[in-house]
C-alpha cells in the first residue's frame, strides 16, 4: 500500500493520520498524530475462527513507552514491565466502544495494539488511540461495523471544552470521554464534581457533534484506502433441530426463569438444560453444542419478552424497583472503618484504612508524576459467584471496577489541609448478582463515615439496564446479573444528592440516542436518592471521633529555613526523632509538617523535639543537655536534637578540674548556659554559670 496522509481540524488542533507508512503486514495500521502526541495502532485477525468457544476473542493492548516522554525506565532491568493501571484502563477505553460493532457470532481472534510513541501533555494519548483503533479496523479486511469517533470533554467556567489541555483538565468540573458512531452513542465514561444530570446529558450530546466529524473523516479515509471486508462464515443451526428444541423447551425455560433467587434460578435452568440434552441426545448426538445455543437464545428471548410485554422482571420486580437493601457499619473491631452494603444478592464489605501522608502512592508513568492520597481497591473472589478458580491477583475487570468506585468518591474526599491522612479503601465482593461496582461505591461511603473521614457528601451508585426490542424501549433500575448478561446496556451512575460524580456506560447494540440517555439518567437519579436514604438510616454523618486504632496526626508549621536542621546531616536528626518516638514525619517544602503517631503521647514528644530544634538558641539561656562525648579539653553537650555545644574544661566547675571525667561522664544530663555563638554557628556552653552556688558546692 502506498503511503497516504489525511488531515482534519479537531477542536483547534490538527489531527493527522498516515496510512501505509509503517506496520504494513498488519491487517490495518494507522499512525495518528494529534498535537505532538503520536500513537501507532494496529489491528490483526486470525484467518480461521477459534473452535469450541462461545464468545468473541477480542484483545486490546495499550503499550506505554517511556521514551515517549523522554524517560528511562527505573529498576535494574531498565525496560518497561507489565502494564500500569493507567494502561489497563486505557485499553478498556479502546475495547468497550469497538466490541459491540463486530458481527454477532464472529469467532476469529482479533488483536488491537496501541503503542504510544510520543506524548504531548496537552493531548491525552488514550483519545488518539481510540481514534486510531477505529481507523485501523475500518480500513482493514476485518469485519467491523464502524467507524467510531471519540473525544474528551471538560467543563470550565460553564463552558464545554473538547479535548481540553493539561491546564483546562486541572480546572475542569468533569472529565468525560464519549465514543460513538455517526448515529448514536456507544460508550461513556466520566468523573465529575457533582454535575447535574442535565449538564451531563448536554455534554454527551455536545461531544457527539464532534464525534460525527471524526466518523466522517474516517469514512473518507476508508473510501480512499480501505480494502473489502472478509466474508464472515457463521455457523448455522439446523432449522428442524431448532424448531423441535423450541417446542420442547420454551415453556420450561420460561418457568425456570421466573425465580427470585439467583442460585435457585440457575439450578432450575441447569435442570432444564440437562433434561433437554437427555431428550435429544439419541436423535441429535452430534449437535449438543447447537442445542445449548438454542437454549441460550430461548432464555434471552423469554427474559426480554417478560420485560417488554409483561413489564416484569425475572425476580418479580417492576422496571423501576430496587432490590431490598440493608447496611451495617463498624463490622470489624480493629479496623479504622468498615461497612457491609447488601442489595439483593449483591453484597460488598468495604474497609477504610487511614495512614500517614508518607503512605501516598506515587504514580510514575508517561504522564506527570502523580501522588495519590486516596485509593480504592476492588477484589472479586470466586466464591462470590459460587465458583472455583485460582487466585492470581487483580484482573482488568477488577482494576476497572476499583477505578470506577475510586472516581465516584474522589470529589467528596476532604483536602489534605482538612484531613491530613492517606486513605485506602478495599472492597471485598462477598456475593455477586450484578452491580458490584456500585455496591462498592455505597460501601465505601459507609466505611468512610464509620472511620470519621469528613466527606463532603455521601455518595451512592446504581446500575441501569436496557432492553430494546424494535421501538419498545425498557430502561431497568438496579440490574441484576442476568439482566446485564442478556440485556443491551450496563449504565452505572454514581453521585450525591446534588449531582453525578461518576458514569460508565457500555452497550451491546450499535448505539443509543439522546432520549434513552435522558430517561436512564433521570431514573438513575431517583434510584440513587432512594439508596442514599437507606444508607443514611444506618449512619447519618461521619463519626466525630476517629477509631482508637487509627493513627493521630499533629500538624505544625515551621520556618522553611529550619527544615535542613530538622532533617540533619544525612537524615541523622529526623531519624533519631523517629527512632525515639516511633512516629512518622512528613515535611513539605513550604514548612508544613505532619507527625503521624499511634498515640498522642508519642506524637507530642516528637513535636517537643522538633520545637526544640526550630527554636533559636539564645545567648544567656539555660538548657538541660546530654553529654555526647568527652575530650581532654571539654565535653560536647547536646542541648536540642541536632544542636550541640562545647563546655570547655575551664567552664565545668568554679574549682580547677584536672580531668573532665571527674565532673561529668557520657550520658549525663546537665544544666548548661549558652555563653557565646560565633559566626560559624558554634555554640559555647558553661556548666559552672548554670548551676546555683550551693549545688556546685554540694557536688564538690
UniProtKB/Swiss-Prot annotation:
Mg(2+) binds at residues 484, 490. It catalyses: RNA(n+1) + phosphate = RNA(n) + a ribonucleoside 5'-diphosphate. The keyword Chaperone does not apply. Its EC number is 2.7.7.8. GO terms for biological process: mRNA catabolic process; RNA processing. Belongs to the polyribonucleotide nucleotidyltransferase family. Involved in mRNA degradation. Catalyzes the phosphorolysis of single-stranded polyribonucleotides processively in the 3'- to 5'-direction. This is Polyribonucleotide nucleotidyltransferase.
Amino acid at each position: 500500500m502506498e503511503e497516504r496522509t489525511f488531515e482534519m481540524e479537531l477542536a483547534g488542533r490538527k489531527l493527522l493520520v498516515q496510512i501505509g507508512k509503517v506496520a504494513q503486514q498488519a491487517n490495518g495500521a494507522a499512525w495518528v498524530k494529534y498535537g505532538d502526541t503520536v500513537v501507532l495502532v494496529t489491528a490483526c485477525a486470525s484467518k480461521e475462527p477459534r473452535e469450541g468457544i462461545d464468545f468473541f476473542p477480542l484483545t486490546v493492548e495499550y503499550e506505554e513507552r517511556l521514551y515517549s516522554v523522554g524517560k528511562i525506565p527505573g529498576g535494574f532491568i531498565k525496560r518497561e514491565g507489565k502494564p500500569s493501571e493507567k494502561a489497563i484502563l486505557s485499553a478498556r477505553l479502546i475495547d468497550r466502544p469497538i466490541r459491540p460493532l463486530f458481527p454477532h457470532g464472529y469467532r476469529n481472534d482479533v488483536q488491537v495494539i496501541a503503542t504510544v510513541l510520543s506524548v504531548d501533555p496537552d493531548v491525552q494519548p488514550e483519545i488518539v488511540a481510540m481514534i486510531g483503533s477505529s481507523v485501523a479496523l475500518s480500513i482493514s479486511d476485518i469485519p467491523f461495523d464502524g467507524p467510531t469517533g471519540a473525544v474528551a470533554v471538560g467543563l470550565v467556567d460553564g463552558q464545554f471544552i473538547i479535548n481540553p489541555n493539561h491546564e483546562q483538565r486541572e480546572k475542569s468540573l468533569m472529565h468525560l470521554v464519549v465514543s460513538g458512531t455517526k448515529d448514536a452513542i456507544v460508550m461513556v465514561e466520566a468523573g465529575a464534581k457533582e454535575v447535574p444530570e442535565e449538564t451531563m446529558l448536554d455534554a454527551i450530546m455536545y461531544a457527539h457533534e464532534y464525534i460525527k466529524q471524526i466518523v466522517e473523516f474516517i469514512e473518507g479515509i476508508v473510501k480512499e484506502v480501505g480494502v473489502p471486508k472478509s466474508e464472515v462464515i457463521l455457523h448455522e443451526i439446523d432449522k428442524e433441530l431448532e424448531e423441535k428444541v423450541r417446542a420442547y423447551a420454551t415453556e420450561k425455560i420460561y418457568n425456570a426463569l421466573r425465580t427470585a433467587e439467583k442460585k435457585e434460578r440457575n439450578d432450575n435452568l441447569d435442570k432444564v438444560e440437562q433434561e433437554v440434552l437427555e431428550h435429544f441426545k439419541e436423535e441429535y448426538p452430534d449437535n449438543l453444542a447447537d442445542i445449548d445455543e438454542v437454549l441460550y437464545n430461548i432464555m434471552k428471548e423469554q427474559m426480554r419478552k417478560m420485560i417488554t410485554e409483561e413489564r416484569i422482571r425475572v425476580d418479580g420486580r417492576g422496571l423501576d424497583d430496587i432490590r431490598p437493601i440493608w447496611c451495617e457499619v463498624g463490622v470489624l473491631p480493629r479496623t479504622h472503618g468498615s461497612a457491609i452494603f447488601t442489595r439483593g444478592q449483591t453484597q460488598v464489605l468495604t474497609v477504610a484504612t487511614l495512614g500517614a501522608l508518607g503512605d501516598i502512592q506515587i504514580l510514575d508513568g508517561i504522564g506527570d508524576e502523580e501522588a495519590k492520597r486516596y485509593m480504592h481497591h476492588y477484589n472479586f473472589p470466586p466464591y462470590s459467584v459460587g465458583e472455583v478458580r485460582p487466585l492470581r491477583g487483580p484482573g482488568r475487570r477488577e482494576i476497572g471496577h476499583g477505578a470506577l468506585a475510586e472516581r465516584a468518591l474522589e470529589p467528596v474526599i476532604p483536602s489534605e489541609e482538612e484531613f491530613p491522612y492517606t486513605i485506602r479503601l478495599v472492597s471485598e465482593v462477598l456475593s455477586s448478582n450484578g452491580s458490584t461496582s456500585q455496591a462498592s461505591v455505597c460501601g465505601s461511603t459507609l466505611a468512610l463515615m464509620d472511620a470519621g473521614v469528613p466527606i463532603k457528601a455521601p455518595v451512592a451508585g446504581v446500575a441501569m439496564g436496557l432492553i430494546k426490542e424494535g421501538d419498545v424501549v425498557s430502561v431497568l433500575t438496579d440490574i441484576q446479573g442476568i439482566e446485564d448478561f442478556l440485556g443491551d446496556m450496563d449504565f452505572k451512575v454514581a453521585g450525591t444528592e446534588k449531582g453525578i460524580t461518576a458514569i460508565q456506560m457500555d452497550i451491546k447494540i450499535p448505539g443509543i440516542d439522546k432520549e434513552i440517555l435522558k430517561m436512564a439518567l433521570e431514573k438513575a437519579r431517583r434510584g440513587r436518592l432512594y439508596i442514599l436514604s437507606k444508607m443514611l438510616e444506618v449512619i447519618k454523618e461521619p463519626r466525630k471521633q476517629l477509631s482508637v486504632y487509627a493513627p493521630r496526626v499533629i500538624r505544625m508549621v515551621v520556618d522553611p529555613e529550619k527544615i535542613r536542621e530538622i532533617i540533619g546531616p544525612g537524615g541523622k536528626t529526623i531519624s533519631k526523632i523517629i527512632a525515639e518516638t516511633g512516629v512518622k514525619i512528613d515535611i513539605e517544602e513550604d514548612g508544613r509538617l505532619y507527625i503521624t503517631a499511634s498515640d498522642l503521647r508519642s506524637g507530642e514528644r516528637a513535636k517537643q523535639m522538633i520545637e526544640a530544634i526550630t527554636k533559636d538558641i539564645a545567648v544567656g539561656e539555660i538548657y538541660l543537655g546530654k553529654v555526647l562525648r568527652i575530650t581532654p579539653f571539654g565535653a560536647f553537650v547536646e542541648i536540642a536534637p541536632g544542636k550541640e555545644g562545647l563546655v570547655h574544661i575551664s567552664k565545668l566547675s568554679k574549682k580547677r578540674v584536672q580531668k573532665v571525667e571527674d565532673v561529668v561522664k557520657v550520658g549525663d544530663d546537665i544544666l548548661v548556659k549558652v555563653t557565646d555563638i560565633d559566626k560559624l554557628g558554634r555554640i559555647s556552653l558553661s556548666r559552672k554559670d548554670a548551676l546555683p552556688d550551693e549545688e556546685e558546692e554540694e557536688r564538690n
